[in-house]
Amino acid sequence: MSKLKTRSSAAKRFKVTATGKILHKKAGKRHNLSKKSKARKRRLDIPGEIKSVDRWKVERMLPYNL
C-alpha cells in the first residue's frame, strides 16, 4: 500500500495537541481591529477546538498527526 499524503493546507491551519485535540485559529483578527474591543481581540487569540462533526474530515487530511 502506498503512503498517505498529508494535506499541506490542513497542516498549516490545524495543530494536534498531545491529548489528541485539534485546535484552529479563530477568524476576525486580521483587519478592522480598531472597532473591536480589547477583550474581544484577546478572546480571538485563544485557539478554538474543532467541532466533533468536522473532526473526521480533519483526521483524514492529517493521517500521521493523530
UniProtKB/Swiss-Prot annotation:
Family indicated by similarity: Belongs to the bacterial ribosomal protein bL35 family.
Biological process (GO), any one: translation
Pfam families: Ribosomal_L35p
Source organism phylogeny: Bacteria, Pseudomonadati, Dictyoglomota, Dictyoglomia, Dictyoglomales
SUPFAM superfamilies referenced in this protein's UniProt entry, alphabetically: L35p-like
Compositionally skewed regions (Basic residues) per UniProt: 24-43
Region Disordered: start-end pairs: 24-44
Record protein name field: Large ribosomal subunit protein bL35
GO molecular function: structural constituent of ribosome
Keywords: Ribonucleoprotein, Ribosomal protein
GO CC list: cytosolic large ribosomal subunit
